[in-house]
Swiss-Prot record:
A motif (Pol A) lies at residues 866-875. It is found in: Mitochondrion; Mitochondrion matrix, Mitochondrion nucleoid. This is DNA polymerase subunit gamma-1. Residues 837-843 are annotated as: Trigger loop. Heterotrimer composed of a catalytic subunit and a homodimer of accessory subunits (POLG:POLG2). Interacts with TTC3. Interacts with LIG3. A motif (Exo I) lies at residues 179-183. It comes from the Eukaryota. The gene is Polg. GO terms for biological process: base-excision repair; determination of adult lifespan; DNA replication proofreading; mitochondrial DNA replication. The keyword Cytoplasm does not apply. DNA binds at residues 289, 575, 785, 828, 1073-1074. Pfam families: DNApol_Exo. GO terms for molecular function: 5'-deoxyribose-5-phosphate lyase activity; chromatin binding; DNA binding; DNA-directed DNA polymerase activity; exonuclease activity; metal ion binding; single-stranded DNA 3'-5' DNA exonuclease activity. A motif (Pol B) lies at residues 922-937.
Amino acid sequence: MSRLLWKKVAGAKVASGPVPATARWVASSVLDPVPSDGRPPSQMPSSENGQLRLNPLLIQMLSRGLHEQIFGCGGEMPDEAAVQRSVEHLQKHGLWGQPATPLPDVELRLPRLFGGNLDQHFRLLAQKQSLPYLEAAASLLEAQLPPEPKSWAWAEGWTRYGPEGEAEPVAIPEERALVFDVEVCLAEGTCPTLAVAISPSAWYSWCSRRLVEERYSWTSQLSPADLIPLGGSTSASSSTKQDGQEQLVVGHNVSFDRAHIREQYLIQDSRMRFLDTMSMHMAISGLSSFQRSLWMGAKQGKHKNPAAHKARAEVPEESQWSSESSSWDWMDISSANNLADVHNLYVGGPPLEKEPRELFVKGSMRDIRENFQDLMQYCARDVWATFEVFQQQLPLFLERCPHPVTLAGMLEMGVSYLPVNQNWERYLTEAQNTYEELQREMKKSLMDLANDACQLLSGERYKEDPWLWDLEWDLQEFKQKKAKKVKKPASASKLPIEGAGPFGDPMDQEDPGPPSEEEELQRSVTAHNRLQQLRSTTDLLPKRPQHLPGHPGWYRQLCPRLDDPAWAPGPSLLSLQMRVTPKLMALTWDGFPLHYSDSHGWGYLVPGRRDNLTEPPVSPTVESAAVTCPYRAIESLYRKHCLEQGKQQLEPQEVDLAEEFLLTDNSAMWQTVEELGCLDVEAEAKMENSGLSQPLVLPAACAPKSSQPTYHHGNGPYNDVNIPGCWFFKLPHKDGNNYNVGSPFAKDFLPKMEDGTLQAGPGGASGPRALEINKMISFWRNAHKRISSQMVVWLPRSALPRVVTRHPAFDEEGHYGAILPQVVTAGTITRRAVEPTWLTASNARPDRVGSELKAMVQAPPGYVLVGADVDSQELWIAAVLGDAHFAGMHGCTAFGWMTLQGRKSRGTDLHSKTAATVGISREHAKIFNYGRIYGAGQSFAERLLMQFNHRLTRQEAAEKAQQMYAVTKGLRRYRLSADGEWLVKQLNLPVDRTEDGWVSLQDLRMIRREASRKSRWKKWEVAAERAWTGGTESEMFNKLESIAMSDTPRTPVLGCCISRALEPSVVQGEFITSRVNWVVQSSAVDYLHLMLVAMKWLFEEFAIDGRFCISIHDEVRYLVREEDRYRAALALQITNLLTRCMFAYKLGLNDLPQSVAFFSAVDIDQCLRKEVTMDCKTPSNPTGMERRYGIPQGEALDIYQIIELTKGSLEKRSQPGP
């Protein structure tokens, strides 16, 4: 039934996906368990008890019992030639014969598996989970929908409209399927204002109480009563998973609409699921980030010739075989993500009118009331447009993502849930107060620096200051009217002036004792006379008061005028955004003072230049200093820096990787690749067709010059900045040397502040303290708007389950609620989930205000958070693809072996090997390794090397990158075409071939050159095939590229198609990097979907009370009832085992290494944090989670501990103790 419906909705036969090797399960009926009476092959090495199993490469595999339960009995051993080829490959890379310590076997009886193999098992589970929602979707597609009502009811709550438009109030729309859209008046907060829905039988509208009932003000705190009811009662007694039938809600960016549905905030999960047309569009015809910029440029008419964009980022990747012009057909089969463009792509017709939306964005509630009918029609048109898009999308989606696990996984991903309590509000308050306090302290430090700098005016000392010499030091003279001459009384001229005696007078040296009454009276008279004298001068003041006369110009610009409503004393306008601030703080880069250039942005001055000390500026285009630069002072400053650092000359040294880079999830690594412009120009294709060796191209501005320092290398020198005695170097920009740095306080420079490269100069503590505070507040400054605007709904006691209210830890005065993260379940072309706050949040750091954000997600009493990180997920996926491609054995490639058997302690893991090969830190090597797997080219490595170690020259970075790629990715080799073989024979050309018949790039170019010369420069296609050879990762990249360049790229496990906008038929040889990246990242999404399906099955099968919370890249978290926590942990371990086995099975590897079968640890905790032992101490949480919030450390359990606690069973029993 389910398969027929799937085919019916898809409109095409469901593809079976990649065909694995012969199944090794004994065929069984759907309900039969996997038989387990077979034995491993006799030639397989095993222990005395028959459980320990090693493959021919001596890698420990699943124990015999687990292998039989999952893969069945029997199995073919790889042929001797494949084994020998693998051993020789491992020997070549120094990995064969490395010692390995066997892991204890895992004795575990798995739940009953269905079908004849793992693929059938997952298909049956996913079909069971998604079938009710697929049936609901089919009812929408097949229905003849009613016409839109001509008039909309002005009534609070839901209204149903009959066939003739008659309005009838209803409690909720009792429908199995709805297309739904919510509109919010942003001026009034996050409370929903109105909504429209359509079902196969009727239209519905909803109006909020705040819209219908006019009040002076409403509370800003949301309660369930403010939200839209859509799924029954909100009382805890009736809100269980078993209540009601399955409901499907369809919307465009439906996670926004879900956040305004009342029942979705209940702790117990509901049976309502959501399908997002925006996510389905990304999976069907989504655009990569660079394609989107091209598409938008073409749409706006800014670039009539899209080929002009080839100078940027991704389009100029490796061309597949030649440098022929790019294809732009992909622009016709894709679009941006908004509803209007998506509707135009799939449906066509007149463009959607989006102007009324501005009333919700900028208007007030009164504006919405006055335009109620028009705005309801606008919302209804969006609903109808979404329905039309859905009609076209769903069959396409099921055809291009045919495995039912994909749909079931996306449905589960769409119900993310983050529980919070009163600590959330406390966190917001503490973080904001700490931020404001530090802001005030930083402001005072900066004002002190400005006031101190003014003192340099005395004796013109500023002229010898390495930073302040070029500021505006001109003084504004004090102006006054001419005074009228008045004859002074003689008595006034004879008044004694207090303190006017000569210096050294005894009256200044001795204590005169307490003043007498006469002296007191005399002083009072003197003060009064002086005051009168000052008052008499008021007539001399100019009509328009001067602004701080007697102060330098730069200082006057920092002080508000007296008539300014926001007047405050001193240089109160000073901020980090001002160009004068880095100078006042005396910032240095490696000991060189920072300097700002109008044409090149922020840089620094390197002393030692002599060729421009006497020469005037060459031309008007050359920047020159209007005042003399104190280059001697700069030389002295740098010498002092070198002595303090204990060095006479800079030497290249490794800089530790900032935690921000490591804490950025690996999914963000692809964004880093794109930001750095890592994608190679069509250099390879040009090299194949040319007779020139590959040049090392330096940026024009950084080309060797006649004048440059010998002791310093950097981004420069830029000699058009003519500073006498100094060279100007630009600060390095994360996007490349051609970009200017606008502020040295940007977050990209935080790692340089931490490692001491960028620091405040000498002269007091104000500068270093301001720099330190800037680092501390950087996270909250950038994220507080997103965090503070999170939509939190607090639940009344009646909506809380009894397990919460009866728990000893329940606080009667506390608040319990939830945040629904607005996750786009497929927000990128790789189908990765996207959400701006929670999916990108870093972990807590002791020097970052508010960075304890994730720990504020706290389980309610009686519940815990159970989750785990998938160890090296993408590395393993890439490795197992390479292993299957090379010899069909786990660990048969060097890359696969290091992933499985490598140990950090022995330096044999992937990251340690790369670090040792290139001479970089292991942390840096980790970034490079992920970048390569994501498809980044050698240019990426060069730029990232220079970003991590700015002291490297471009030549040194290029050499390191070339060495790294030669060892890891290998060298490109080519197989000659028939024409190529004929030319070699006819021209009698000497060609050096490998054992497999591959030729080098040099030989390929030689054949092309000679053939062209002998045939009057005819162009010959002499290469039929190309591959990577000789590297630790060559076979893996060959497999990834073979998938990426196939006619219809599909993920190897679930068979999901790449976006139509990246199919080879429309992009030809372009966007190779995006396509290679897609293979790994999209396979990782398959991994997540398999996990979600398996966990849902085990929770339902064994009555584990829990629900999915969130998935952050390679980790998953579930909210689980406390008494079920250990069973949920075991379910997670079994899920990981079956998911990895599914990958191996689909690739023809009917086995799995023991080292990757289970999570290294499953976390059981009361809050969301990276490690259960992290106390999350930060400036806003200085005492930690336990002392401040009462949250103790959690548990991290491995598979052996979990089996001991649960007796290896998922069945419910009396709860074991910890």
